[in-house]
Amino acid sequence: TVVVVGDVKPDEVYQLAQKYFGPLQPEQLATVKPQIEVAQRGKRTLELKAPAELPYLMMGWKVPVVKTAVEEWEPYALDVLAGILDGGASSRFSRELIREQQVAAGISAYNSAFSRLDDVFTIAGTPAQGKSVDDVKQAVLNQLDKIKTEPVTEAELQRVKTQVIASSVYQLDSVFYQAMQLGMLETVGLDWRLVDSYPDKISAITAEQVQQVAQKYFIDEGLTVAELIPMPTDNTTPRPTSGDPHAR
């Protein structure tokens, strides 16, 4: 996929594309067999022991994305939920888990509404001094239970939706991000115009919808918990210079 954005002349871009890519003959791609994941029937856990200074927790729940959702609004409600939990200094994680309860030194929540297949709503964090991974895990579950039983207030909902929309709009100030978003949407089989409709989709989300997705998807049957157990660090051993740091 080639995406060109910025202060360019479309006719010139098209001519250059024809010049450099036109002579290339199309190839017949092999048909990709459907990747069907075995349905998860219960909570999955894994532990990784590795040289590290601090323990680390990751919790992931399987959730739908725009391309796979039966209810179109659900992925957008999950984006709003991520903002409620981790949307700046006034978010619930920052206010309650870090400052008030002091159970986490750092914690984040992330959802991706745009991908080819179902994705994972991820919460990750590091315990505060004197606290354990289990303490953080329980504090996270308590926050999710609160959202399941108590709808967010209209004031909090509006504040978070404004933040989510502002973040998506400000990112488009970057020419690189514009190209990345347009290319990503087309590559996963979605309409690039979803970039423009995203703010309206977020604005339409209600407190009841946020509560519904929390109740529907944040269950043990769709949960995977991973814990990094720190082991003594050998300072004489060179650290890896590449790769996924979460897999070490």
Say what each PLM segment does:
Residues 23-68, 83-132, 155-166, 173, ...:
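Non-catalytic beta-strand/loop surface segments
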Residues 15, 69-74, 132-136:
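Solvent-exposed, non-transmembrane alpha-helical starts
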Residues 19-28, 141-152:
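A common structural junction motif
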